[in-house]
Amino acid sequence: MERAMEQLNRLTRSLRRARTVELPEDNETAVYTLMPMVMADQHRSVSELLSNSKFDVNYAFGRVKRSLLHIAANCGSVECLVLLLKKGANPNYQDISGCTPLHLAARNGQKKCMSKLLEYSADVNICNNEGLTAIHWLAVNGRTELLHDLVQHVSDVDVEDAMGQTALHVACQNGHKTTVQCLLDSGADINRPNVSGATPLYFACSHGQRDTAQILLLRGAKYLPDKNGVTPLDLCVQGGYGETCEVLIQYHPRLFQTIIQMTQNEDLRENMLRQVLEHLSQQSESQYLKILTSLAEVATTNGHKLLSLSSNYDAQMKSLLRIVRMFCHVFRIGPSSPSNGIDMGYNGNKTPRSQVFKPLELLWHSLDEWLVLIATELMKNKRDSTEITSILLKQKGQDQDAASIPPFEPPGPGSYENLSTGTRESKPDALAGRQEASADCQDVISMTANRLSAVIQAFYMCCSCQMPPGMTSPRFIEFVCKHDEVLKCFVNRNPKIIFDHFHFLLECPELMSRFMHIIKAQPFKDRCEWFYEHLHSGQPDSDMVHRPVNENDILLVHRDSIFRSSCEVVSKANCAKLKQGIAVRFHGEEGMGQGVVREWFDILSNEIVNPDYALFTQSADGTTFQPNSNSYVNPDHLNYFRFAGQILGLALNHRQLVNIYFTRSFYKHILGIPVNYQDVASIDPEYAKNLQWILDNDISDLGLELTFSVETDVFGAMEEVPLKPGGGSILVTQNNKAEYVQLVTELRMTRAIQPQINAFLQGFHMFIPPSLIQLFDEYELELLLSGMPEIDVSDWIKNTEYTSGYEREDPVIQWFWEVVEDITQEERVLLLQFVTGSSRVPHGGFANIMGGSGLQNFTIAAVPYTPNLLPTSSTCINMLKLPEYPSKEILKDRLLVALHCGSYGYTMA
C-alpha cells in the first residue's frame, strides 16, 4: 500500500511538471534526459533528478565522448556547471578530440564558467589532440579580458600546438590587437618560429593584419623569412595587402626597392602587386613620384635586356610589358590624371609627373636607333638589288631596262647555275658580297622584329597613359609614320606580331588604315581570337562570369510578345552588365540558363524580320533581308532598329548565333565598307544588270540623255532626286558613267535607308566597337553572326560524346544517326534546336558549340525505355536524353514527335 502511494505521488509530480521526476537506471538513457536541462541551465530540475540517482556525472556519451560538464561549459550553463562540479565532475576530463570543459568555455567566451572551472582546479596547460590550450582558443577569438584572467594561471605563455604555433601566432593572424598586446605583456616570445619557421610577424602579414604587424614591429619584432625563404613582404604582396606593406616599409625602408623589383616576378599575381603599388602611391605626392620613377628605371633596364639578342625573348618581353602595365596604372590613378583634366605633360609642359618618364627616354632612344639602323640596311639592300639586277642583265647580254625587272631576292644554293656564265664560281665577288649583306639584313630582322615590336608596344602604352581617354598620342603617331616601312617589313615577315604587340592599331583608325591590308590577310581564326580578346579585355575574370545571377539582372520576357517585351527590358538594362552576361526567363516558365538564352536569341532574330514590324524586307533571292526604306510606316521604327542593333551586338559579344541572314550590302554598312553596283542585285537584279551594261559598253553615241538625277516615289508622287548638287543638269557621259553608277548605287543602297542604318549601328556599337568589327569582311561577319547555313551530319557524328551507358557502336546510336541522315534538313535544324537551343552551327562546326560554361560537345545520354517515352534534352549542356528504344522505327517516330511538339518551352528538370 505504501509503495503504491509513492508511485502515485511520482506520477502526479511528473504530470504536473510535464517531465520525468527520476532518472532511468542506465547512464546512456539518463544522460539524454539530463542534457537538454543542462543546456537550458535548469539546475533545480537537474539537482532533483541527481539527488536520488546513481548516475555517473563523468559519464561520456555521444560520438565525441563528452560529459555533461562539457555541455554546461560549452553552453555557458554556469549553475549546472557548479552543480556538476560539486557532484564530483572531473574538470580535466578530455573528450575524443582532447578538449576539456575549460577549452570549450574559452572557445565560446564563457567567462563565469571559466572562473568556476579554475576554482575547481581545471588545468590551463592541458593540450587537445592538436596541441591547442585554452589560451590558444582565447587568442583565436580575441577574448582579451578572459585572457588577462587566465594567463596568470599559465605556466608557459608560449606553449605550442602541433604545428609549433603559439597563442601569439594565432592572435596576430586574426588581427586581435589587444590580445597581442596582452600576450606580449605576459612575456610571449615575439620572434618565436613555428615548425616551418614562420614568426608572429609572418602570420600577421599572411592575412594583411596591418595593426598587429605594427604592434609587433614597434616592439622590436625581427623581419625573418620562413624555412622556404618566403618573407612577410612576399605574403603581403601575394595577398595585395597594401596597408601592411606600408607598415613594413616604415620600419624597413629597404623593402621599397624589393617591392619594385617584384614587378619582374612572373610568379606574383599582377593584380595583387598592382593593388599594393596603388595603395603606396596614394600616401604622398613624393612617394607617388618615387614609385613611378623606380618603375620607369626597372622598365628601362628590362627593355635594354630585351633588345639584347642574347637574352631570353619570352621572359624579358613578359617582364617589360608587365612592368609597363603597372607603371601606367599607377600613373593614371595619381592625383593628377588625364581623366580629371589636369595637365600631365602631354601638352609639352614639364611637370613633375611628366618627368617620371625621363628614365624611359633612354629605352625609346635605343628603339629609335634600332629602327633607323634597320631602315638604312633595307634601303641599302634595295640599292644593291638594283645594282645586282644590272650585273645579271649584263651577264646575260640583255639590253632591258633594270627597272622592269622584279626586285632582287637573295637566291638559294645553285641558283646561279642557269646563268650564261654556266658555273657558280663565275659569280663576281662584289655580287656575292651584296647577296651576303642582304641575307644578313634579313637575319637581323628575324632576330629583332619580335623584340623591337614588344618595346614598341611598351612605348605605345606609356604614350597613351599620358593622354586623355579616346585620344592617340601625337608623338606615337609621328613615331609610326616615321618607321612605317620597317614596321610593315616586320609584319610581312611575321604577321603574328600584329596580334601579339600592335594592339595600338585597334585604338587609332589612322594607324589601322596603314596595316589593314596586312591584317585582313591573316587567318580568320587568328582575327577572331584577337577580336574576342580585346572585346572582353577589362571585363571580370572568367571565374566571375558564372557567379549567382542577381534577380534584378534577369531579362523577364513574354513569349507571346517577345519582340516588344524584349525591347523594353533591354532598353532599361545596364549595358555593362549585359556585356558580362545575360540571364533570360520567359514569363510563367521556370527554366533559366544558356539553353534559354540561345532560344531567346533564336526566336528574337526571327521576330526582327517579322513583316508586321516593317523593319526589313526580303531580298530578291528570298533568303536574305535588307532594311526597309519604308519602315517609317511604323512610328517606332528607329527605336526598333536600334534594338535590332543591340540584339545582334549582344549575340556577337556572347558568341550566340542568330537565325537570320542579311544582304551583303547591309553587312558592309555594319563594317563601314562602301557599297558598289553589284550589291544592287540583292534588291533589284534587273536594275543591277542595267548598271553593269552601262559600265561594259560605250554610251557615247547611244543618246541615253541620262543626267545625274533619278525619279523616285515619295509618298505616292514621283520626284526627281539629284545624285549630286546640280545633278539634274549634268549629263552622264562615257567619262563620268562610273561616278554615275556609284552615286545611284549609294542612293538605292545607302541614302534611302540612312536613318535606319544609323539607328541600327547606334545599338550595335553599344556592344561591338567599330574598330574591332572592321577586322572582318562582309562574308566573315555573316559567319560570325549566323554560323554555317548547312548541317554537316558527318561533322556532327564526329563531335558527339556518349554517356550513361551509350557507346558509339550501340544499336540505338546506330539507328539514331541513320534517322538523322534520313530526315529533312529542316528536321535536323529542329533536332539541333531541341538539344542546344540554337538552330545554327557555329563557324568551325560542331566542335565549337558552346555550353553553359564554354565549349560543350553534343552529348547523347542513355535513358531506360518505357512505352511511348519521348526523348528529352538539357540545353545548357547540349545533352539529348535518348531512351533505349527497341527498334529504329519506334526511335524515329518518338524523335519526330518530340521535335515537332516539344522544341519550345522550358521547365525545371
Curated annotation (Swiss-Prot):
Induction, per UniProt: Down-regulated in sporadic Wilms tumor.
Compartment list: Golgi apparatus, Golgi stack membrane; Cytoplasm; Endoplasmic reticulum
Pathway annotation: Protein modification; protein ubiquitination
UniProt-listed GO biological process terms: Golgi organization; membrane fusion; protein K48-linked ubiquitination; protein ubiquitination; Rac protein signal transduction; regulation of cell migration; ubiquitin-dependent protein catabolic process
Related illness: Defects in HACE1 are a cause of Wilms tumor (WT). WT is a pediatric malignancy of kidney and one of the most common solid cancers in childhood. HACE1 is epigenetically down-regulated in sporadic Wilms tumor. Moreover, a t(5;6)(q21;q21) translocation that truncates HACE1 has been found in a child with bilateral, young-onset Wilms tumor.
Effect of residue 14 to E: Monomeric; promotes autoubiquitination and ubiquitination of RAC1
Region (Disordered): 398-433
Record-annotated HECT domain positions: 574-909
Activity regulation field: Sterically autoinhibited in its dimeric state.
GO terms for cellular component: cytoplasm; endoplasmic reticulum; Golgi cisterna membrane; Golgi membrane; nuclear body; nucleus
Organism taxonomic ancestry: Eukaryota, Metazoa, Chordata, Craniata, Vertebrata
Protein name: E3 ubiquitin-protein ligase HACE1
Domain of life: Eukaryota
Post-translational modifications reported in the UniProt record: Autoubiquitinated.
Recorded consequence of changing residue 20 to E: Monomeric; promotes autoubiquitination and ubiquitination of RAC1
Effect seen on changing residue 353 to A: Promotes ubiquitination of RAC1
